[in-house]
A protein has these predicted regions:
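Basic polycationic patches enriched in arginine
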Residues: 15-21, 26-28, 59
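Bacterial N-terminal signal peptides
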Residues: 30-44
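Sequence-structural signature of mature extracellular/luminal beta-sheet repeat domains
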Residues: 47-408
Length: 408
């Protein structure tokens, strides 16, 4: 028997398949939710900034692997009182950048190489080299029209003043002042009265010794009259050695004849990336502030490597007094170029390498050197009384005097 719809047989009647309609509804809801989610995700992705490629490290930020093993020295006693703006220039003239600074042969006066109220002397008619008495008064000056970029200096036992003029005029500067074409890339010897006595290098022309020099950073005259010159300045900004990369020390006779050259660009022993300053201890050892490599390298006077020290930081200026106290001034350190280290003046022993004191950076709205915080000098000198002088480059300019409050 065939039972019709609605019959009372125990066999269930056939009904419409309602679960299909419910499943379709649920699918529609799910698809709608997926569409809304996709739309929202699209909005978020559209609003999100595009991912930027990782920034390249700054030029010259690399360093020797050994440096990373040294714990930064930033927290030591500071036994010095800081006196900013030491020295008053004549005629109301303002200080410019100063990195060349040295005590006079008398141990009382200080010579400073002012970059003519700016950061170069091109076109200037003032004397860049000034002699300061203990009160900061200028008692002598010279060098007008002769020195373009005083960078490092020394005073020999006869009182002669040696100046490293580290760069030549730029094309833009020469367009205005063509008469400066033959200045720079030289080491100049002046008498105590400021008369030019000797020139090493060819003015305005970088190159190789003996005829030429490339960006001489500093000059040092040994007790026997031998002359040491450190080249070159821009090497600290290089991470790879270009064909013309320069990092060298040259030794010259007292009359200016080349004796020998040692060193090369690089990160290894007896290699340099910007040998920025020179000093000599009582034993006649030559200390080289290898700034780009964040270290001191120590040599005998024939160029034999004796030791390497990292504990004095990324040094711009270096001086050693008669007691073998070493003064190392750092104007550059920051998280890129010397991670973990602060700018400042570190004082210690040239005999043992121990660092005793740390004078922190000046407060400054703008940093010196490569960045970071604060400002500190680039050149350093010490007088016979133990007063220390910093030559300032950057937002803080002129000369700073550090007066010892305690005796060692």
């Amino acid at each position: 028997m065939i039972h019709g719809l609605g019959g009372d047989s125990t066999t269930p009647a056939v009904r419409p398949h309602r679960p299909v309609r419910g499943k379709l509804a649920r699918m529609r809801i799910a698809l709608s939710a997926l569409a809304l989610t996709s739309l929202a995700l699209g909005v978020v992705l559209a609003q999100a900034p595009a991912q930027q490629p990782a920034a390249a490290p700054p030029r010259g930020a690399s360093g020797p692997a050994e440096h990373a093993k040294v714990t930064p020295i930033n927290n030591l006693p500071n036994p010095y009182e800081t006196i900013r703006n030491f020295g008053v220039l004549p005629d109301g003239r303002k200080w410019g950048s100063v990195s060349a600074i040295n005590a006079d042969v008398d141990g009382r006066h200080i010579w400073a190489g002012d970059r003519c109220g700016a950061n170069a002397c091109v076109g200037s008619n003032v004397d860049p080299m000034v002699k300061l008495d203990p009160s900061g008064k200028v008692v002598a000056s010279f060098g007008k029209g002769q020195i373009l970029w005083p960078h490092g200096m020394d005073v020999d036992r006869q009182g002669n003043i040696w100046v490293a003029d580290a760069r030549s005029a730029t094309p833009q500067e020469l367009a205005k002042f063509p008469e400066w074409k033959d200045k720079g890339h030289t080491v100049l010897k002046f008498s105590p009265q400021g008369k030019l006595l000797m020139t090493i290098g060819t003015g305005g022309q970088p190159g190789n010794p003996p005829e030429k020099l490339t960006e001489p950073n500093d000059v040092l005259v040994a007790p026997d009259g031998s002359i040491f010159i450190a080249e070159a300045h821009q090497a600290q900004f290089l991470d790879q050695n270009p064909p013309n990369g320069v990092g060298r020390i040259t030794k010259w006779s007292p009359d200016g004849k080349l004796i020998k050259t040692f060193g090369a660009y690089g990160y290894g022993t007896s290699e340099f990336r910007g040998p920025h300053s020179l000093a000599m201890d009582s034993r006649g050892r030559l200390f080289v502030a290898d700034r780009g490599n964040r270290r001191i390298q120590i040599f005998d006077q024939e160029g034999k490597h004796l030791d390497t020290w990292y504990q004095f930081s990324r040094i711009s200026g270096l001086v050693i007094d008669k007691n073998d106290t070493l003064y190392a001034i750092d104007s550059e350190s920051d998280d890129n170029y010397n991670p973990g280290w602060r700018k400042g003046l570190r004082v210690g022993s040239a005999r043992t390498g121990k660092v005793w004191y740390f004078v922190p950076e000046h407060v400054s709205k703008q940093p010196t050197g490569m960045g970071g915080i604060g400002a500190m000098g680039e050149g350093v000198a010490v007088d016979a009384q133990g007063n220390v002088y910093g030559g300032e480059v950057g937002p803080v300019q002129g000369v700073t005097k550090f007066v010892p409050r305690l005796k060692r």
